[in-house]
């Protein structure tokens, strides 16, 4: 039998390759804040962080997936299998799941990293082999059932896997934590995918329906060439696009856009707006302060904005900017932030009273 680590060893979180130190720092900070002891086990460019904690099952609901910034996915580790036999990977997994409850679905995954991506074929083939074995053992429903825990097997190489569990209500609903979004030909720029992903990731379906309604009024600061403006028009919002640069003509032709040639960093509306969005290349602290001014002055009710992170101490800068924003906003707000799949050296922030 393959060696097995002790079950319930910690949390496994997937992230963008190269951002393991930021995720490790965030997990350490959030766990300590919640009163849990633990430590991060990771290597740069692995694309994941294992946060070792004896009380992982109790810690998981305290670290909500939607509130974690650098985690694409959050899983509770049931077992680590570091020396699997390629001739029989299924038997040791069934053995560690002998006392586990029935699961509503199975996802077999790998980190989104240089070492992890070549494992996609193994993950797909192994999932097809493991599903019938789990069903025969009474451990997996015939059809996906989101009311039951979801089983994850995460391969980090061909003979090393983590067997994990996720709460479907508190985890990413996409394999690898990556939403599959298609860039439509009419999108003015790839940045449109950022705002599409932000709306999917930072808001629940119920919140999206309540907060992104046709007829709402929005401002897009630093709008050119119009990627984020275009996304807002697809929500049937009326948009003030603020930029000295040009917008794509087909964005203007929607009839929902007014292009104002001005500096998006200094412009503000005469009347309060429902939404403000901003994806400007500027120092993150300056952006955080300007976004706070918008809320303090009552110029918008909801906002989505990007913070471009420095090359070093990115977790420290993230905390500083978000604290600065909340201190200066002058009102209680729900603030959620994520490093999205379509983000690069940046995070995307939602701020809203959510009511």
Curated annotation (Swiss-Prot):
A molecular function (GO) term: S-adenosylmethionine-dependent methyltransferase activity
A Pfam family reported for this protein in Swiss-Prot or TrEMBL: RLMM_N
Q: Which residues bind S-adenosyl-L-methionine?
A: 191, 224-227, 243, 263, 279
Q: Name one GO biological process term.
A: methylation
Reactions performed catalytically:
cytidine(2498) in 23S rRNA + S-adenosyl-L-methionine = 2'-O-methylcytidine(2498) in 23S rRNA + S-adenosyl-L-homocysteine + H(+)
Q: Which UniProt keywords apply?
A: Cytoplasm, Methyltransferase, rRNA processing, S-adenosyl-L-methionine, Transferase
- Main localization of the protein? cytoplasm
Which superkingdom does the taxonomy of this entry point to?
Answer: Bacteria
One Gene Ontology term, aspect cellular component: cytoplasm
- For the protein in the UniProt heading, the enzyme class is transferase
Q: Does the keyword S-adenosyl-L-methionine apply?
A: yes
Q: What are the subcellular locations of this protein?
A: Cytoplasm
Q: What is its EC number?
A: 2.1.1.186
The active site consists of 308 (proton acceptor)
Looking up NCBIfam families in the UniProt record yields: PRK11760.1 (NF008734)
Q: How does it assemble?
A: Monomer.
According to its UniProt entry, what is the function of this protein?
Catalyzes the 2'-O-methylation at nucleotide C2498 in 23S rRNA.
Q: Which family does it belong to?
A: Belongs to the class I-like SAM-binding methyltransferase superfamily. RNA methyltransferase RlmE family. RlmM subfamily.
In terms of HAMAP family, this protein maps to: 23SrRNA_methyltr_M
Protein name per UniProt: Ribosomal RNA large subunit methyltransferase M
- Organism name: Stenotrophomonas maltophilia (strain R551-3)
